[in-house]
Amino acid sequence: FYTERGLYFSASMTQPPETLIERLSARDQFVNRDRISLSVDTSGTGLYAYWFAVNLGGSLMDGTILPERQYSSNWDGPWRGASQRTETGWSVEMMLPWSMMTLPTSDSGDRDIGIYIQRAAASIDEDWAYPGLPRTQNQFLSRFPKTKIKGIKPKQQLTFYPYVSSSLDAVDDSTTQKAGFDLFWRPTTAFQVTGSFNPDFGNVE
């Protein structure tokens, strides 16, 4: 379901508990484990999409998709996701704010978005998806089934991500501290300004 704030997604996977594969990792790391992912074509026309994945254990993955199947993990969005083991398998929940995604301008707030869902079962090394779009076909993003959303008018957003890091050099017996921040300002749903102060590309998310 969705609200003016964002898109909410949950899934419950039935699977024998002894077959579950849970591995922790840093963000955006592709590791063989159970996973569920959701791709959202906010353009509604197959121009671009965002993908979000939650692995069993809670590690997150995300990025963008360009036509037709150009996946990238260079984009990281401020969204929430969690997983949990259950008696019959495992479950996933996601909260995806509209404000982090580019949405075409709409006076009424009504839009069509494309949705694609994929599940990975690591124990048998298989993926299942809806809709079933074979990798041998050229069309992918443009074939996402459309869902109409109404009354979505995300407000202007200013997002601030500070960071601090510290490193120790055991050879020189020295320490280094760094601090900085990333700033995101979205005045409209189709425009975003991004800035960084003293960026540390090795900082831990």
Give the location of each predicted region.
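Structural preference for beta-rich elements and adjacent junctions enriched in aromatics
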Residues: 1-205
